[in-house]
Curated annotation (Swiss-Prot):
Pathway: Cofactor biosynthesis; Fe-Mo cofactor biosynthesis. InterPro entries: Nase/OxRdtase_comp1, Nase_comp1_CS, NifE, NifE-like. NCBIfam families: nifE. Belongs to the NifD/NifK/NifE/NifN family. It comes from Methanococcus maripaludis (strain DSM 14266 / JCM 13030 / NBRC 101832 / S2 / LL). GO terms for molecular function: nitrogenase activity. The lineage of its organism: Archaea, Methanobacteriati, Methanobacteriota, Methanomada group, Methanococci. This is Nitrogenase iron-molybdenum cofactor biosynthesis protein NifE. GO terms for biological process: nitrogen fixation; protein-containing complex assembly. This protein may play a role in the biosynthesis of the prosthetic group of nitrogenase (FeMo cofactor). Transmembrane segments: none annotated.
């Protein structure tokens, strides 16, 4: 059996007993050795391609192939990670207790103020609730958490079970809001609504648009105020971005939703500009805010020195203030000057090393420039929930011969790591131990990390973590 990833002929062909891919860049025979017995392999063939042959991208945005155990999340999980960083809100899960395991530390967002968002709340539906309905239990739960915590808002998340039994989430939330005077927001996030958790991201954005944004006025308006959309303050990333804009003379009104409050998000419609971390859900929210409130938006990326510099200049150029532009250039010069020597030291060991990325759709291409600044080469990039536009971005950023993968299973990922032998894998915690057991260094760039990677200082942190992972002596000893 021969697997051919050539875009002119993606069909399964009969051949000898060894499995291989026919490519301009030949991939060794053993990549899918352990997958021979899986009938679903044919359906997975088109979800991998090699950049540079033409403008092709992997088949994506589809149901996971039956029998291939992937690591995707659900729609509820997608909604939860977007809204969870709102620090003074209660996040109440209407469903079985197991769904409440998706809590604040799934994304690890940090806060300078309220810590209420770190508490977990669930209606803990039981068998009798499934039979007789859970609306009464939900109503009583909302009243109880409001009495105990007096939150800025209560987000109520619907789960699969609730969608099946037909509880009227909106009606209960409306009644509870009238009874408590607290903002009670339904999030119709039944997990089975889509195979792709990004549908949950959009539902979370809709909840903010329908019930939060535009409902309050800011304490004061600033002529150069911005919102940062798609920044969730994982490991304190936001705190490496805000000071840079403040030095330029720009006021960051709020991030949506990292380290935010209900009041800040509610008054975000008065900001003069939205800057958008390039994720599909973030672009959707920015587009809706422009349509509804006339706020323009620009895309930014704070991973790496060059991308951070571009993001600062883009905002200064948007406002067109000559003094701001001058301050921005002075700031950029000062920041890079202070980091140049340290980066050079890391590059001595990292130059020429190879990297595999299996992460969120945005990071799978946004990190390419950052690794280029360390003279490292991307040889594989993939994501679990990428859309066509995400893979187009990956294709446009990586070098010819890079393998691009959609929705890889653990077995596939292990085989690809063994064949490509990258010097480091950049991914999340779910892939961490696959990498380490394969003898390949790992860097966590997803929600579980504890080190900030955004902005200028964040890039130094990133380079240090990558350098430490690659140069740890255990890898040299284990390979012997």
């Amino acid at each position: 059996m021969v697997l051919n990833l050539d875009t002119e002929n993606r069909k399964m062909q009969d051949g000898n007993n060894d499995d291989d891919f026919d490519l301009e860049v030949k991939i060794p025979n053993s990549i899918f050795e352990k997958l021979k017995s899986i009938e679903a392999l044919k359906a997975r063939e088109s979800q991998m391609c090699v950049s540079g042959k033409d403008d092709s991208i992997p088949t994506c945005d589809k149901n996971s192939t039956p029998g291939m155990i992937t690591q995707r999340s659900c729609v509820y999980g997608g909604a939860r990670v977007v809204l969870m960083p709102i620090t003074d809100a209660v996040h109440l899960v209407h469903g079985p207790i197991g769904c409440a395991a998706c809590t604040w530390d799934i994304r690890g967002s940090k806060s300078t103020g309220d810590k209420l968002y770190k508490n977990g709340f669930s209606t803990d539906l039981q068998e009798k609730d499934i039979v007789f309905g859970g609306e009464k239990k939900l109503y009583e739960s909302i009243l109880e958490v409001n009495k105990l915590y007096h939150p800025g808002a209560i987000f109520v998340y619907s789960t699969c079970v609730v969608g099946l039994i037909g509880d009227d989430l909106k009606a209960v939330c409306r009644q509870a809001q009238e009874a408590t005077g607290c903002r009670v927001i339904p999030v119709q996030s039944e997990g089975f609504k889509s195979f792709n958790k990004t549908a949950g991201h959009k539902l979370a954005c809709d909840a903010m648009l329908d019930y939060v944004i535009g409902t309050e006025e800011p304490e004061e308006e600033h002529p150069y105020s911005i919102n940062i959309i798609g920044e969730f303050n994982v490991a304190g990333d936001l705190w490496g971005i805000i000071p840079l804009y403040e030095k330029m003379g720009v006021k960051v009104h709020t991030a949506i939703t990292g380290d935010s409050t209900v009041a800040k998000v509610a008054s975000a419609h008065r900001s003069k500009l939205n800057i958008v971390q390039c994720q599909k859900s973030s672009n959707y929210l920015a587009a809706q805010m422009e349509k509804k409130y006339g706020i323009p938006s620009i895309k930014v990326n704070f991973f790496g020195l060059d991308e951070t510099t571009k993001s600062l200049r883009a905002v200064a150029e948007f406002f067109g203030d000559e003094e701001m532009i001058k301050r921005t250039e002075e700031l950029i010069k000062s920041e890079i000057k202070n980091l140049r020597d340290e980066i050079s030291e890391y590059k001595k060991d990292l130059s020429g090393r190879t990297v595999a990325i299996y992460s969120g759709a945005h990071k799978s291409w946004a990190l390419v420039s950052a690794f280029g600044e360390l003279d490292m080469e991307i040889i594989m990039s993939g994501t679990q929930n990428g859309k066509p536009e995400d893979y187009q971005q990956i294709r446009d950023h990586v070098c010819e011969g890079t393998l691009i993968v959609d929705d890889a299973s653990s077995m596939e990922l292990v085989q690809l790591l063994k064949e490509y032998k990258p010097d480091i894998l950049i991914s999340g915690a779910k892939e961490k131990y696959l990498s380490l057991k394969s003898g390949i260094p790992h860097c966590d760039f997803n929600h579980d990390r504890i080190t900030a990677f955004s902005g200028y200082q964040g890039f130094i942190n990133f380079a240090r973590v990558v350098h430490t992972a690659v140069m740890t002596p255990i890898w040299r000893l284990s390979r012997k």
